[in-house]
Curated annotation (Swiss-Prot):
The chain crosses the membrane at residues 34-54, 78-99, 114-134, 179-199, 227-247, 289-309, 321-341, 348-368. Its main location: mitochondrion. The lineage of its organism: Eukaryota, Metazoa, Ecdysozoa, Arthropoda, Hexapoda. GO terms for biological process: mitochondrial electron transport, ubiquinol to cytochrome c. Heme b b562 binds at H84, H183. The main subunits of complex b-c1 are: cytochrome b, cytochrome c1 and the Rieske protein. GO terms for molecular function: metal ion binding; ubiquinol-cytochrome-c reductase activity. Component of the ubiquinol-cytochrome c reductase complex (complex III or cytochrome b-c1 complex) that is part of the mitochondrial respiratory chain. The b-c1 complex mediates electron transfer from ubiquinol to cytochrome c. Contributes to the generation of a proton gradient across the mitochondrial membrane that is then used for ATP synthesis. Signal peptide: none annotated. The gene is mt:Cyt-b. This is Cytochrome b. Disulfide bonds: none annotated. PANTHER family: CYTOCHROME B.
Length: 378
């Protein structure tokens, strides 16, 4: 019998098995749209970044002016720059929702998929930080100085590590050049990891809102979820483009429109909004090394979730007390984001410390509460 080329061609058949004939649970909701949205975001960032790199100069004398030149003189350069900057914000928003959905529906039980996902999250955060340095404004320079300086807290190797990253004794031309190099290459590494992430996901199949085995109720990915994803793309792009045209500089720091000056420190040094929760956790620990460990743990703690899982049912939809705890955690993360943008003074210091304790306590209380609920059901 004649088979279509998408099933017989050695290369096209791989894409076919991943996007067309893939068996998917029939009941996955809109929360499952964010995976494909992240793929769209990554493509958008790579494309806009590629065109920006054609006009950008990775030199401390010309970097700031080259960004200015892109926005003023290059055809639609302003659109590319703002699309890239706001695209990063939307990328992280989708990323946090995607991780949140994984925590809520306990998708972390697919160990390999979850672990690669956390590595992607780390790499994306590194890429975002490197990109923040490139315009070489005040916040770029001082943000790079403060964050890279944290590595000096590493025992014995600290200062050597910092100078190795800087390429000298201060943040200078060598630092900017290597930051641009890594900012350019990381998205392609993320793309490769994303394919591995999908490979592991397709080994097990997707989770679903009921947390049950859906092998008896699978439908082909195309046309059902292809159209669902396309609808998600349209809504996402509509919101992004509206944001670009109406609130283009809303998420950027005014300090970064001033050329970098090593002799003048900004009143309040802070990263982009999507790092503020981790930055607040870092600042809440009075000890430098302790702060760095807490900063890394704020993301790395996601890796322990598969090992602390104790519930009989899969997903928090069956655990009302855990749902309250989860949404409390979302509020805590939002408040940490707010605290990260506040100056280091009372009452913000104490508030940040309380919120940090609440943030980490979620990972301890959640499995205990699930166990308690299971006991009540017995």
């Amino acid at each position: 019998m004649f088979k279509p080329i998408r099933k017989t061609h050695p290369l096209i058949s791989i894409a076919n098995n991943a996007l067309v004939d893939l068996p998917a649970p029939s009941n996955i909701s809109a929360w499952w749209n964010f995976g494909s949205l992240l793929g769209l975001c990554l493509m958008l960032q790579i494309l806009t970044g590629l065109f920006l790199a054609m006009h950008y100069a990775a030199d401390i004398e010309t970097a700031f002016n080259s960004v200015n030149h892109i926005c003023r003189d290059v055809n639609n350069g302003w659109f590319l720059r703002i699309c890239h900057a706001n695209g990063a914000s939307f990328f992280f928003a989708c990323l946090f929702i995607h991780v949140g959905r994984g925590v809520y529906y306990e998708s972390y039980l697919y160990h390999m998929t979850w672990n690669t996902g956390v590595i992607i999250l780390f790499l994306t955060m590194a890429t975002g930080f490197l990109g923040y340095v490139l315009p070489w404004g005040q916040m770029s320079f001082w943000g790079a100085t403060v964050i890279t300086n944290l590595l000096s807290a590493v025992p014995y190797l600290g200062m050597d590590l910092v100078q190795w990253i800087w390429g000298g004794f201060a943040v200078d031309n060598a630092t900017l050049t290597r930051f641009f190099t890594f900012h350019f290459i990381f998205p392609f590494i993320i793309l490769a990891l994303m394919m591995i992430h999908l490979l592991f996901l397709h080994q097990t199949g997707s989770n679903n809102p009921l947390g049950l085995n859906s092998n008896v109720d699978k439908i082909p990915f195309h046309p059902y979820f292809i159209y669902k994803d396309i609808f998600g793309f349209i809504v996402f792009l509509w919101i992004l483009v509206t944001f670009i045209w109406k609130f283009n500089y809303l998420l950027m720091d005014p300090e970064n429109f001033i050329p970098a000056n090593p002799l003048v420190t900004p009143v309040h040094i802070q990263p982009e909004w999507y790092f503020l929760f981790a930055y607040a956790i870092l600042r809440s620990i009075p000890n430098k090394l302790g702060g760095v460990i807490a900063l890394v743990l704020s993301i790395a703690i996601l890796l322990i979730l598969p090992f602390t899982h104790s519930s009989k049912f899969r997903g928090l939809q069956f655990y009302p007390l855990n749902q309250i705890l989860f949404w409390n955690m979302v509020i805590v993360a939002s408040l940490l984001t707010w605290i990260g943008a506040r100056p280091v003074e009372d009452p913000y210091i104490l508030t940040g410390q309380i919120l940090t304790v609440l943030y980490f306590s979620y990972f301890i209380i959640n499995p205990l509460l699930a166990k308690f609920w299971d006991k009540l059901l017995n």
